[in-house]
Regions:
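Non-transmembrane alpha-helical segments in soluble domains
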Residues: 183, 232, 300-304, 353, ...
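Short, flexible loop/turn elements at secondary-structure junctions
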Residues: 51-53, 77, 88, 160-165, ...
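Short glycine-biased active-site loop of nucleotidyltransferases that positions the nucleotide triphosphate
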Residues: 74, 205-209, 253-260, 377-378, ...
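Substrate-binding/active-site clefts of carbohydrate-active enzymes
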Residues: 118, 138-153, 160-341, 605
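Carbohydrate-interacting/catalytic domains
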Residues: 1-152, 176-186, 454-457, 468-476, ...
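Conserved alpha/beta catalytic core and glycan-binding cleft of carbohydrate-active enzymes
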Residues: 308-310, 325-490, 498, 519-575, ...
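Intrinsically disordered, polybasic Lys/Arg-rich low-complexity tracts
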Residues: 636-755
Length: 755
């Protein structure tokens, strides 16, 4: 055990200021801000701030009764950097800068580089010493430096620190306490990382942290900076990575913050057509200004280095890339070349990623980019933006639209399930089901699903199984793993009492098992970004809303994935098999353990010689209604495949689970209830589960389907050509989603309160 961070000393040489003005001071926080020092045998605090337009600046606080001018600062460079040493000041003393503008007005500003701040509604900065924390995560750090960032498992649990779980009376846990509560849950559920909504200091709870005023201070709502260090340290000790939401695109207009810092535009673009997001009520950074570049890049590295954060999810990248983002005609000006691209922001993002990943190639730089901007995750040297991951917003929009559609009409929307594969390997994608999808009237993930109570759970299980098998890393917002009915509310904890109900506990158990299965099977994560890890089997059975594909690992092991997006039992469904031999069902979302009907394959399924879907052999299986199935593909071809399958159609069983190899820990509740109803849930007409018989093959006749209220006609299975070549070509030309050609509007409109 040893402190891994040396005490941050202010640097009094001219070099930090020179680098700062060149845009190359990547550790500006070591120079600017408030630092404990001893000068001529006297301890105190040295303050430094950048304010190029100020006529005068003084430091005010309790120590001088907030009297302007009593402790004036002086320019150290004769230009824009101000400094003052005040003896006798100590840690936790509250202060602000009193700035005299060129117009003669006085404005009181929090320190842009403060390490700690008062808790809202107060907004003063606090002197804080970051040194002295003892880290215990050396083993984690060493392992991360050796890890394969791109080709490793990543299954992220996105969460809001103040509303995941609360104490009695609705009080939040502090950072360290939160870790103690969170770690057992994350370990039990099998997630690899947690991703925190912004924890940089912010004044307005309703912004969820996306309106930042303190880019170097963890919000004091949940404790001190060292409490946050303890959170990260404990997570790492438990083998859990920590990703943090970081917001360089814009900042709020709070008078104590960065806005018009010295009476004029400093951090924001001075051009009103470029410097403001009117729809959001926030200001846009001046990305072309060197001092702003030093500020933002220093902030990014600060969290990665001083707090050992494993990666940053960079918010609202699309708003940075386009000058016309959410702006009407006449509200924006083209760049010097006449285009709508923000050339300064593009250059900044490349510089940011080159700097961060140049120092720390094992860290994550994840772009929330909602358009089809090309080469987001390609190196800047090749013309890319230099991120190593990007959220797949096209997949998210298409799939949520598809899953909300009544199953009776899904056949006409089949392209929404398959379209993402045209571009799945064009970027290093993360599949996000994030906080943005469960707020503002959109409904929780469970309540997006069509049908009645049981139907919603079956749909959600099917979707989760499909999502886990789709190429790309995974992200799920808190509460969706157990079927939160209500939309997320940042003021309240999740509805944990829902786990007293069978369906919610069974859904949670399914997600737990699915997460464990994911980690144990490299085929689901080792080759996420190449056609080498994926192959279509059935891409176009739109009439029956069925797809099937293979996922592969580097050793050649394969998993066959079959998704039935209709509440129809399909007996005798025949599909091509890549290898002859025995196929073993290893996960089934319809397993009774997970709340399904229990239609499972208790016996292995053998191939027969009938060619299908471009393969020399095929298998015939039973697809439970609304389900995702995983089969283990034989690793070696047998000399002689069985001509006919000797297996009988699968039978319902509630006793024996087919889950093999994954951790299966059913949630046990002594007072579990039968059913939980959603609040104000509109009645939805139930689509009855029916049986449909696939076209009978010449060598095998499955059992006749029983009569039910509905009799959808099954389409004959037709051989299809492999689509990999077509998809590779299409990937070069098609955008990420057919409906998304313009930047998507964000719904976050909350304005920051006045000071």
């Amino acid at each position: 055990m040893k402190p891994t961070e040396e005490k941050i000393q202010s640097n009094t040489s001219d070099l930090p200021v020179y680098l700062f003005k060149q845009g190359n001071n990547c550790e500006a926080y070591r120079y600017f801000g408030a630092h404990l020092e001893t000068r001529v045998g006297e301890s105190g605090v040295v303050f430094r701030v950048w304010a190029p337009h100020a006529a005068a600046i003084s430091v005010v606080g309790d120590f001088n009764s907030w009297k302007p001018g009593s402790h004036p600062m002086r320019k150290v460079d004769g230009d824009s950097v101000w400094e003052l040493f005040i003896p006798g000041m100590k840690e936790y003393d509250v202060y602000k800068y009193c700035v005299t503008t060129r117009a003669g007005d006085l404005v009181y500003k929090a320190d842009p580089y403060a390490f700690h701040a008062e808790t809202r509604p107060s907004n003063g900065s606090k002197v804080y010493d970051l040194s002295g924390f003892t880290w215990h995560d050396a083993a984690w750090q060493t392992a991360q430096k050796k890890a394969d960032v791109i080709n490793g498992p990543m299954n992220i649990y996105e969460m809001h620190a103040g509303s995941w779980k609360q104490k009695e009376g609705g009080k939040p846990y502090n950072y360290s306490e939160l870790a103690d509560e969170l770690i057992p849950y994350i370990k039990d559920m099998g997630y690899t990382h947690v991703e925190l909504l912004p924890v940089m200091e912010y004044p307005f709870d309703g912004s969820w942290g996306y309106q930042v005023t303190g880019y170097f201070a963890p919000t004091s709502r949940y404790g001190t900076p060292k409490d946050f260090m303890a959170f990260v340290d404990k997570m790492h000790a438990a083998g859990i990575g920590v990703i943090m939401d970081w917001v360089p695109a814009h900042f709020p207009k709070d008078q104590f913050g960065l806005y018009n810092f010295d009476g004029e535009a400093c951090y924001e673009d001075p051009n009103p057509k470029r410097g403001e997001h009117k729809e959001w009520g926030t200001m846009v950074f001046d990305f072309g200004r060197n001092e702003v570049q030093s500020f933002l890049i220093s902030s990014a590295l600060y969290w990665l280095e001083q707090y050992h954060i494993d990666g940053l999810r960079v918010d609202a990248v699309a708003s940075m890339l386009y000058l016309d983002y959410n702006r009407k005609q006449g509200e924006w000006e083209p760049n010097k070349d006449g285009g709508k691209e923000n050339l300064e922001a593009i250059a900044f993002l490349r510089k940011l990623n080159n700097t961060v990943l140049g120092r720390h190639p094992h860290k994550y730089m994840i772009a929330e980019e909602s358009t089809a901007w090309p080469m987001v995750t390609k190196p800047a040297s090749d013309g890319g933006l230099g991120f190593n991951f990007k959220w797949n917003m096209g997949w998210m929009n298409d799939m949520l639209s598809y899953m909300k559609t009544d199953p009776l009409f899904r056949s006409g929307n089949h392209n929404k399930v398959t379209f993402s594969f045209f571009y799945a390997f064009s970027e290093n994608f993360v599949l996000p089901i994030s906080h943005d999808e469960v707020v503002h009237g959109k409904g929780s993930l469970l309540n997006k699903m069509p049908g009645e109570y049981d139907d919603k759970f079956a749909n959600l299980r099917t979707f989760f199984g499909y999502m886990m098998a789709h190429p790309g890393k995974k992200l799920l917002f808190m509460g969706q793993e157990f079927g939160q009915f209500a939309e997320w509310n940042e003021t309240k904890q999740l509805d944990w009492m829902l786990l007293d109900y069978d369906k919610h506990a069974e859904l949670q158990n399914y997600v737990r098992t699915l997460n464990a299965f994911y980690k144990e099977h490299p085929a689901l994560w080792q080759i996420d970004y190449s056609w080498e890890g994926f192959q279509w089997i059935v891409p176009d059975d739109s009439q029956q809303s069925v797809i099937a594909f293979l996922r592969k690992d580097a050793a050649g092991k394969q998993i066959l994935v079959i998704c039935n997006f209709n509440p129809v039992l399909r007996e005798g469904y025949t599909l091509g098999a890549p290898v002859s031999g025995t196929y073993k069902e290893i996960l089934n979302s319809d397993d009774a353990t997970f709340g399904g009907s229990g239609t499972v394959h208790n016996k292995p399924v053998r191939t027969h010689k009938k060619p299908q879907h471009g393969f020399e052999q095929s298998i015939t299986v039973t697809l439970p209604p609304m389900s995702t199935l995983y089969f283990e593909v034989p690793t070696k071809r047998t000399r002689k495949a069985a001509e006919d399958s000797t297996d009988k159609p699968a039978k319902k069983t509630a006793k024996k689970s087919t889950v093999k190899g994954a951790v299966e820990k059913a949630v046990k509740k002594t007072t579990r209830k039968a059913k939980a109803e959603p609040d104000a849930d509109k009645p939805v007409k139930k689509t009855r589960t029916t049986k449909a018989k696939a076209a009978e093959t010449a060598d095998e006749k499955p059992e006749k389907a029983k009569k039910t209220a509905a009799k959808p006609k099954a389409a004959a299975d037709k051989p299809v050509k492999k689509t990999a070549a077509k998809a590779k070509t299409a990937a070069k030309a098609k955008p990420e989603t057919e409906a998304e050609t313009k930047p998507a509007k964000r719904t976050r409109k909350a304005k920051a309160p006045k000071e």
